[in-house]
Design a protein with these regions (language model features):
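Short, basic (Lys/Arg/His-rich) helix/loop patches that form interaction surfaces
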Residues: 3, 53, 71-76, 95-168
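Long, amphipathic, Lys/Arg-enriched alpha-helical "connector/arm" segment
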Residues: 2-5, 58
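Glycine-centered helix-boundary capping/hinge motifs
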Residues: 4, 23, 48, 144-145
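Conserved tyrosine-mediated DNA breakage-rejoining catalytic core shared by Y-recombinases
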Residues: 12-107
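Alpha-helix N-cap/helix-start motif at helix boundaries, enriched for small hydrophobics
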Residues: 4, 8-13
Length: 168
């Protein structure tokens, strides 16, 4: 709602992408499920462009709280807290990045690189776009005022608010 990002772009945000002091974020990647490979992948945004998005005090506060909460949960879960990784895969002149999560009891393969996502469940696993879509559908069915709601509605609301405030 505060940034107009697509769902996969929100899932792909890392703490390295966010500047809380200057209140902007850099959209570099997107997370999506590849049905052909039966894998969650980290890849470029829809238009394959990196962009900078400013945000205000409200979102800055939400993000600061989320970061503190993640630290607390990492401590509480201990070795059972999941860490997120990606692995570069090259096939047929194409490079893509597969997503994996492992808890502290599992050995980390040498070709895995840790990535620090913003949108995590309490156990440290990435909050997948499919889970958010399911929650939106459920809310849409259960709450009459949200009939027809889906995550992309937030992107439209963001754009409408920008235009009504004079953006071009």
């Amino acid at each position: 709602y505060f940034t107009g990002l697509r769902l996969g772009e929100v899932a792909g945000l890392t703490w390295q992408d966010i500047n809380l002091e200057e209140q902007y974020l850099i959209v570099r990647r997107s997370v999506r499920y590849n049905g052909a490979r039966h894998k969650t992948e980290i890849g470029p945004t829809k238009r394959k462009k990196v962009r900078v998005v400013d945000f205000g005090d409200t979102l800055a506060g939400i993000l600061k709280t989320a970061k503190k909460e993640q630290r607390k949960q990492r401590f509480q879960y201990g070795q059972l807290y999941h860490r997120n990784y990606y692995k570069e895969v090259r096939e047929k002149n194409r490079v893509h990045y597969e997503y994996y999560n492992l808890d502290g009891t599992q050995e980390i393969p040498m070709d895995y690189t840790e990535i620090f996502f913003v949108c995590l469940r309490s156990d440290g696993c990435l909050e997948l776009p499919s889970t958010v879509e399911t929650a939106c559908r459920s809310a849409s069915r259960k709450v009459p005022q949200l009939e027809g709601f889906h995550f992309h509605t937030l992107r439209h609301t963001y754009t409408t608010n920008l235009l009504s405030n004079g953006a071009q």
